[in-house]
Amino acid sequence: MTGSRIAGMVAVFVLPGIALAVVPTSAWADDTEPARPHVELSIRSWLFTNGETKWSHNASGLDPQLGNPTSKLTYKDNNSHILELSGKVNFKKDWFAQVDGGFSVAFHRGTLTDDDYSAVGGQHLFSQTTSNITGSGTQFVNADIGYHLRDYPENRGNLNVFVGYQYWRTQYEASGVTQVVCAPSGIPGLTCNPAGTISNQGQVVITNTTQWHSLRIGVQSEYLLTSRFSVEGKLAFIPASYLQNDDVHHLRQDLQQDPSFSMSGYGIGADVEAGARYMIYRGWFLNAGYRFWWNYLLDGNLTVHPVGTPSASVPLTEFQTMRYGFTLGLSHTF
């Protein structure tokens, strides 16, 4: 996303709110929100998000001619739009439960880069290909329970803590193959097409499905600058996350197709969100902000599933998933 585009969005979403924030609060005295509503329902769009999943593995333990890493795959999508619905219920004075769910409504721009390495003659890249990305995109569910920790002086806002579960799934489909780099691997039978070769146009060649199951612990806060305008933030640390990743290489007749490679492991992560909130009418709010999610593998394995021979496992050297972008939404409290 270009700097001018970001600046334009900031101007549209943030500057009107700042201007409204300086209006005297007494002018809005009749529209102030009740102290703590029982229910809040929201619809939100995660706009122009960029996503990335990348992983690599080390198969040199099976064949010392292979590099370390042996392969590195990077899936990147751009300007994907995600629709999100959420509900929050306050109960027993200081407790609340919140559920968020989202799914992609536009997901068709991106690139897969597939790098392969040889150790013959020293570690070197001998093949690089790129493919166009489509797929079902991203879906997620967050389910949290929280506690109202404190109110700020003069009823200016509050600070809450929460713990919960996050399910985050991303599926990429890579279509077509463009050979960018091809050099001698030094490994008998391991070759590539000449650089510049384009093949399998319009054909899905790889399907990759990533699933993270995560424990979240975090804090969230809202601070009122006026009776209508507030700023808010949310920070969640993920101390434990379980990864499941299936990779199907549709052109590889020597590999099984359900899946060709499977990956699993444990990691950590973080979710960060900051934004502003403006009451347009009693109980109705416009929300705008920015969000960043990240999950990172600490330890895991890749298992290859060949046809006719036993499966074999090798260590993953990297696996991480991230997504970031602006948010814009409408919420109602009652």
Q: At which residue positions do the language-model features occur?
A:
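Membrane-embedded beta-strands of outer-membrane beta-barrel proteins
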Residues: 85-87, 141-145, 161, 217-219, ...
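Extracellular/periplasm-exposed beta-strand and loop segments of Gram-negative cell-envelope proteins
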Residues: 51-80, 103-141, 167-212, 239-273, ...
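Residue-level signature of outer-membrane beta-barrel architecture
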Residues: 87-91, 147-149, 221-223, 227-229, ...
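Short Gly/Pro-enriched loop/turn and capping motifs at secondary-structure junctions
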Residues: 281, 291-298
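Transmembrane beta-barrel strands of outer-membrane/channel proteins
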Residues: 39-49, 99-105, 147, 161-169, ...
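Short loop/turn motifs that connect adjacent beta-strands in outer-membrane beta-barrel proteins
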Residues: 30-39, 92-97, 150-159, 225-231, ...
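Cleavable N-terminal export/targeting peptides
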Residues: 1-38
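Short, surface-exposed binding/anchoring microloops in extracellular/periplasmic proteins
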Residues: 212-215, 223-224
